[in-house]
Regions:
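Hydrophobic alpha-helical segments and helix pairs
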Residues: 61-110, 114
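N-terminal charged segments
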Residues: 1-68, 78-81, 132
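Short loop/turn motifs at secondary-structure junctions and domain boundaries
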Residues: 23-27, 140-145
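Glycine-rich acetyl-CoA-binding "A-motif" of GNAT/NAT acetyltransferases
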Residues: 37-38, 156-158
Length: 158
């Protein structure tokens, strides 16, 4: 069994908690940095983010042992999050809540509304409103990747 399959098995123990890692894994966007029975550290290349899932702080530290630097990281509990923040000097690392829509059919969009990717013409607006990351180069990359979306009504971004 290869490392990606072993990582998947670990993450599928709690698929809702690790939805942010399983999605990129399914899309072939991650590589396994380190893997143990008690956790996994992935690197999401397009997102330029390390993604840590660990059963304990000790496991998290061991999984990160070979990583010299991180600029963007996610963790799934406060203790390993605090470790990443302190070890890699990530002052913007903070808690978040995830939600997942698990149905196969997309939610209906009311008449007159549209969800669509945002292009470079929306860069300034994204930079002002996207508080998680304020690095302009990162935002340009995410726009180019087609992963920034907006809700429009009558052609106007809401």
């Amino acid at each position: 069994m290869d490392a990606l399959q072993k990582a998947r098995e670990y993450l599928e123990r709690d698929p809702l908690l690790y939805m942010d890692m399983l999605g990129p894994l399914d899309r072939g966007m991650v590589e396994v940095v380190s893997l143990r029975e008690d956790g996994v550290l992935l690197y999401n290349g397009p997102g330029e983010a390390f993604m840590l899932a660990a059963d304990s702080l000790e496991a998290g530290k061991a999984l990160c042992a070979g990583v010299e630097a991180m600029e963007i990281a996610t963790a799934h509990d406060g203790e390993t999050g605090a470790f990443l923040r302190d070890r890699y000097h990530l002052p913007d690392l903070r808690g978040c809540t995830q939600a997942a829509y698990l149905e196969k059919e997309p939610l209906p969009v009311p008449p007159g509304f549209e969800i669509r990717p945002l292009g470079e013409e929306f860069f300034s607006l994204i930079l002002v409103n996207y508080h998680s990351f304020t690095d302009p180069e990162y935002i340009h990359k995410r726009i180019a990747a087609g992963v920034m979306h907006g809700a429009f009504q009558k052609g106007e971004l809401l």
